[in-house]
Amino acid sequence: MESTLGAGIVIAEALQNQLAWLENVWLWITFLGDPKILFLFYFPAAYYASRRVGIAVLWISLITEWLNLIFKWFLFGDRPFWWVHESGYYSQAPAQVHQFPSSCETGPGSPSGHCMITGAALWPIMTALSSQVATRARSRWVRVMPSLAYCTFLLAVGLSRIFILAHFPHQVLAGLITGAVLGWLMTPRVPMERELSFYGLTALALMLGTSLIYWTLFTLGLDLSWSISLAFKWCERPEWIHVDSRPFASLSRDSGAALGLGIALHSPCYAQVRRAQLGNGQKIACLVLAMGLLGPLDWLGHPPQISLFYIFNFLKYTLWPCLVLALVPWAVHMFSAQEAPPIHSS
């Protein structure tokens, strides 16, 4: 395994030295591949284009992110930014690599969450676009464009994770394969508009299941905070370590989103706009308004105490689906109805 990890450092070193001029591009790509962006941008954008696809993106994101957390606890993968120091291989001749503000994630490294979660969650978008293109284009090359864009983007995300020393190549490959398989398996099986208890029990199962696994491993003598200690030890700047990269931050996001999805689907606002046919202008207005609400909503997720952060993060991602699915479309629909001119009979 050490030889595999050493080869990964060589690849990261080559990327940083040969493609240093693309640094801002790699940082932007790793931002676009962040699982948080799936919840905060890809989900509303997909939802306002297609209700079914948007719900699929949110559901697959929260389930896959939870699975990624469990996989990481069992696989104990190192991250390059600390392994290059901990291994001792480079004490005589230090590797010519450096960290970035997004390098210092605190969870274990295998498999890559960016690749696995994003790969799975973007699968329904890719298949929906492929179906649309297939009905309108005769050229075979045009028909494969959505699949090609999907693969190209995920490959770029994987390379960006290697570039910033967040993952080794084999962790990226594992994430890409696992994400594509999960996306393929889950897309046809996404629950649509189930009873509220289903979503509440899903959120409860995510929290209780994680707690059971955590305390079982802890009882067996496994220290699941080992990666947090290494991240604090070897990160070049303390301000680069963000609390939302901790494992339980993703759990609060996933369980909150599951509960919020159920509340949104059973809200009076959603019932009013469920069968309304919003025009393209109204859909764009919904997306712009939802993105505008991100600022005050994001403020909820950053209290100084770690326990309060988890609580507020849960509430934030519970509220977000309610805004996207119900409150924002309802507000736009009602405003548009008031602005529409009255119809006079002849």
From Swiss-Prot:
Protein activity control: Inhibited by vanadate.
Recorded consequence of changing R253H: In SCN4; complete loss of activity; peripheral-blood patient neutrophils have an increased rate of spontaneous apoptosis; transmission electron microscopy of patient bone marrow cells shows an enlarged rough endoplasmic reticulum in myeloid progenitor cells consistent with increased ER stress
Main location: endoplasmic reticulum
EC number: 3.1.3.9
Record CDD domains: PAP2_glucose_6_phosphatase
Variant or mutagenesis effect after changing G260D: In SCN4; complete loss of activity
Expression (tissue specificity): Ubiquitously expressed. Highly expressed in skeletal muscle, at intermediate levels in heart, brain, placenta, kidney, colon, thymus, spleen and pancreas. Also detected in testis, prostate, ovary, liver, lung, small intestine and peripheral blood lymphocytes.
Active site residues according to the UniProt entry: H114 (proton donor), H167 (nucleophile)
Reactions listed under catalytic activity: D-glucose 6-phosphate + H2O = D-glucose + phosphate
Pfam family, one: PAP2
Top enzyme category: hydrolase
Annotated membrane topology: Multi-pass membrane protein
Residues the record lists as binding substrate: R79, R161
Phenotype upon changing M116I: In SCN4; complete loss of activity
GO CC, alphabetical: endoplasmic reticulum; endoplasmic reticulum membrane; membrane
Effect of G260R: In SCN4; complete loss of activity
Keyword vocabulary terms for this entry: Disease variant, Endoplasmic reticulum, Gluconeogenesis, Hydrolase, Membrane, Transmembrane, Transmembrane helix
Entry's localization field: Endoplasmic reticulum membrane
Residues exposed to the Cytoplasmic side: 46-54, 136-146, 187-197, 274-283, 329-346
Biological process, per Gene Ontology: gluconeogenesis; glucose 6-phosphate metabolic process; glucose-6-phosphate transport
Lumenal side: 1-24, 76-114, 165-169, 219-254, 305-307
Pathway(s) served: Carbohydrate biosynthesis; gluconeogenesis
Disease (UniProt): Neutropenia, severe congenital 4, autosomal recessive: A disorder of hematopoiesis characterized by maturation arrest of granulopoiesis at the level of promyelocytes with peripheral blood absolute neutrophil counts below 0.5 x 10(9)/l and early onset of severe bacterial infections.
Family: Belongs to the glucose-6-phosphatase family.
Protein role: Hydrolyzes glucose-6-phosphate to glucose in the endoplasmic reticulum. May form with the glucose-6-phosphate transporter (SLC37A4/G6PT) a ubiquitously expressed complex responsible for glucose production through glycogenolysis and gluconeogenesis. Probably required for normal neutrophil function.
Name of this chain's protein: Glucose-6-phosphatase 3
